[in-house]
């Protein structure tokens, strides 16, 4: 369970509103709490990290969260809402598929971003532009490219080789890769809120760990 040390690190990270600091705090907390041998926190998919962390926190410091939610109808009124942690699930889109058909013979198999990749690609201190950063994320999630006769593993390629190969794809092929990320499993919860000023009831979709600590 959480100790005072872990809770203090987490609170300071959340108060900073710095995503990298929050991510590092989550990683540190999970390493302290997970007893299973062979589990490498850095290699777990981001959505597994978020789900495990949320449930460890729930068992340790309370099984509900009070969050501030902005009412969609006016975009400014905030209301407090209680969420029970056991109701928050990792949702997978039915259209999601790790295998992407690039043409009649070639298939690209993707893997999910790990926490390590998430931090490296989102909080790099160099002055990468958004396009380059996005390409790096995609390249880091390539697992293997294969056809009926051969396969080419991403681990055998350099980062530059992967990025150069991505640039040879056409628009439709690239859109299929974007769909992989858009539909990949997410920590998701749908709540209903009523604006006290307008009396309008709306549904709000909350996604990702930081949504539940707002």
Predicted regions and their residues:
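Short, surface-exposed, charged amphipathic helix/loop patches that serve as local interaction elements
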Residues: 1-214
